[in-house]
Amino acid sequence: MITDILAMNLQVVFCGINPGLSTAHHGYHFANPNNRFWKVIHQAGFTERLLTPAEEQHLLDTGCGITMLVERPTVEATELGRDELLQGGNAIVEKMTRYQPRALAVLGKQAFSQAFGIKKVSWGRQERRIGETQVWVLPNPSGLNRATLESLVASYQELHQALQDNV
């Protein structure tokens, strides 16, 4: 069972779509060796060193957390139903209202669109807020995403810099 890594007043909560089978098997977020999440957040400046999935609880020490839209593991996120994503969006709103991080970073444009019922979504900071929490949409670091490591890091650095600048 994959559990949220959450605490009050974090800098950012990264919101994955759902666990892949490798993640579900290992019991840690972003555990598939092809997933670039841990490398990306390190290179973007969120962690001082490269963490392994087994060290996910150390994220709290850096002001970061992790949650997911849907808890059901699948091979690909495309296997998720629309209702599952909408329910996930509602659950995320409840969690963010409760924990009040400075930012929520949803990892995937299509997942964000479906979970929050927003048709046109751009990358980066969104107009929508959840209470005082800024909402961002960042590219998914999955190995299935063709984005380069450099472009992923640049997107995540934009969020990191905005948080550093108190924007």
Curated annotation (Swiss-Prot):
Gene: mug
The protein's Enzyme Commission number: 3.2.2.28
Keyword entries, A-Z: Cytoplasm, DNA damage, DNA excision, DNA repair, DNA-binding, Hydrolase
Function: Excises ethenocytosine and uracil, which can arise by alkylation or deamination of cytosine, respectively, from the corresponding mispairs with guanine in ds-DNA. It is capable of hydrolyzing the carbon-nitrogen bond between the sugar-phosphate backbone of the DNA and the mispaired base. The complementary strand guanine functions in substrate recognition. Required for DNA damage lesion repair in stationary-phase cells.
Major localization class: cytoplasm
Bilayer-spanning residue ranges: none
Quaternary data: Binds DNA as a monomer.
Localisation: Cytoplasm
Protein name: G/U mismatch-specific DNA glycosylase
